[in-house]
Amino acid sequence: MNSIPGWLLRHRIVVEPYRGDSSTGPLYGPPRELRVFLDEQTRTVRSPGGEDVTSRSTAYAAPGALVPPLSRATLPGGRVTTVIQTARRDGGGLATPDHLEIQLE
């Protein structure tokens, strides 16, 4: 199996990629819709800075998705959240679906 099957990506989120900071606050790129499987389960995850933070949702996307940490994401119910971090999950040729795990605040 190469990639997570498209029929599993039942939800759509809108991602505004984080581009950096300015004197007026964070800068985001243009919004784009991303097909994902959304799991709204609260758990503790580690941020890129090493802090333990609470993630309220995890989205699973196709492995080629580009979602930088600190990007803004709008979930199907309208909740706007921030990407804590992402993790590429590659089975290395095993019969597991490769995907991108997106941990959301």
For the regions a protein language model found, what residue spans apply to each?
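N-terminal intrinsically disordered, low-complexity, charge/repeat-rich segments that act as generic
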Residues: M1-L8
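Short, conserved turn/kink motifs that form compact alpha/beta structural patches or helix kinks used as
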Residues: G6, R19-E105
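A short, Trp-centered hydrophobic/proline-enriched beta-strand micro-motif
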Residues: L8-P17
